[in-house]
Amino acid sequence: LIGHHETDGWVSDYENQIEAAFNLYKDHGVQIVKTGYVGKLLDGKERHSSQFGVRHYRKVIELAADKHIMIDNHEPVMPTGLQRTFPNLMTQEGVRGQEWDAWDKDGGNPPVHTTIIPFTRGLAGPMDFTPGTFRFENPVLPQTRVQTTLAKQLALSVVLYSPLQMASDEIENYERNPEPFSFITTCPTTWEQTIVPEAKIGEYVTIARKERGNSGRWFIGSITNEQPREMQLPLSFLDKGKRYLSLIHISEPTRH
């Protein structure tokens, strides 16, 4: 169970209520809060990246830490590594995430987008891109289609690092696709080792991550832009002399 605090940018009103809200969550065992600040200005006058905004974001994270609550911050300031001081800051948006696919008239993010952000926004820390879209047609905008595939949505859980993953689709769409959804529910979010066997910014990327602990399991995500291609995956990072069983999710050849 995750609490959602959408402030609409009115942070002074939020600060007047936040401690009571966090106390309520603590009493009921709610351990995660997703905050939001939709709007160009905070309190109608301050930029998100202003001193006013930075102090507010830190205040929320500090208070949440005191209540043992984790934060997923949307519409944040530029990531600065604050999660090193406050590890309850699990992840942040700060990226043109998958929500754009829901309302953009051109179908949202183009396939090339996710081959770029691991090397730009991804360098600044965990990002909540909200992968996991299983239905690609939009009845609200019937002329559009989300520019992705089911296999790519699963791969993004590995390619885009976030210790807290938020799946983006409706429950009914997951119930209709139980096998791929099981990948989302079992894919780790913290890793012991990460390597990049093959990548070219804006074209393709393959990322392999080893699950933390003693399982020895590796998870590999591989994505491309609009162009189909065959990619090489050297497996030299696997333990020599050990046998592995692979479960592979793959897109149709005509999709990306």
What do the PLM-derived regions correspond to, one by one?
Residues 1-139, 143-149:
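Aromatic- and carboxylate-enriched substrate-binding clefts and catalytic-loop regions
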Residues 246-256:
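Residue-level detector of conserved catalytic or cofactor/ligand-binding positions
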Residues 68-75, 100-102, 165-174, 193-195, ...:
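Acidic/polar loop patches that form or flank catalytic/metal-binding clefts of enzymes
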Residues 71, 159, 220:
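Conserved, mostly hydrophobic/aromatic
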Residues 151, 155-197:
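Catalytic cores of secreted or luminal carbohydrate-active enzymes
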Residues 201-240:
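Carbohydrate-binding surface patches
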Residues 239-247:
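Short aromatic-acidic-glycine turn motif
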